């Protein structure tokens, strides 16, 4: 008789990694779209810096903490305004620090409403929309992810399938029928 193991939530480092990859990808896609809109460049050259991994991963992990503290206290509109203000603060702080080492990958000096070339008011709406997407899609779904110790090795299921004791051709009708597995290692509630 198999014992049930409660799946573990993702660690902070695992969530940080997912947030970093998400931010990095969005940065590349945004710069590609911006290049197309501004210069009608059909090559869609999306660019970013490796620093974006640290910047986005840490920023979104902090937004996650804010979400957990604020979700029962204020509505989504107010939360997204708070996230946007935090994003400006974080972008300015990390940009200012990186500029000390000549490593800041962005410069908003050409924008009319920039401050020290590190932040610009023209990005308020995109940052607000990004905050909404991050809360509603990224953070909420990432917090639902679980490590499933049982599915650590795909070999266990293969052996059960070959021996007739597993799900085999009856996929979805076993004891784990209600569980959904993203890739055999991560389980979503």
Curated annotation (Swiss-Prot):
Q: Which residues lie on this side of the membrane: Extracellular?
A: 39-43, 97-114
- Key words, A-Z: Membrane, Transmembrane, Transmembrane helix
Keyword Membrane appears in the UniProt entry: yes
Q: Which residues lie on this side of the membrane: Cytoplasmic?
A: 1-17, 65-75, 136-189
Q: Name one GO cellular component term.
A: membrane
What Pfam families does this protein's entry cite?
Answer: ABC_trans_CmpB (PF06541)
Please indicate if the UniProt record lists Membrane as a keyword.
Answer: yes
Q: Where in the cell is it found?
A: Membrane
**Can you name this protein?**
Transmembrane protein 229b
This protein's species is Danio rerio (Zebrafish)
């Amino acid at each position: 008789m198999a014992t049930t193991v409660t799946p573990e939530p993702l660690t902070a480092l695992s969530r940080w990694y997912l947030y970093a990859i998400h931010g990095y990808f969005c940065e590349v896609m945004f710069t590609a779209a911006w290049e197309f809109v501004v210069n009608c460049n059909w090559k869609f050259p999306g660019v970013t810096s490796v620093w974006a991994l640290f910047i986005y991963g840490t920023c979104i992990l902090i937004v996650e903490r804010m979400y957990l503290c604020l979700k029962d206290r204020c509505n989504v509109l107010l939360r997204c305004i708070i996230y946007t203000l935090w994003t400006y603060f974080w972008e300015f702080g990390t940009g200012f620090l990186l500029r000390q080492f000549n490593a800041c990958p962005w410069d908003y000096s050409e924008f009319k409403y920039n401050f020290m070339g590190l932040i610009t008011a023209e990005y308020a709406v995109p940052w607000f929309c990004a905050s909404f997407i991050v809360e509603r899609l990224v953070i909420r779904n990432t917090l639902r992810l679980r490590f499933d110790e049982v599915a650590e090795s795909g070999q266990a299921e293969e052996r059960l399938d070959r021996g007739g004791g597993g799900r085999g051709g009856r996929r979805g009708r076993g004891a784990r029928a209600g569980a959904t597995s993203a890739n055999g290692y991560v389980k979503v509630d």
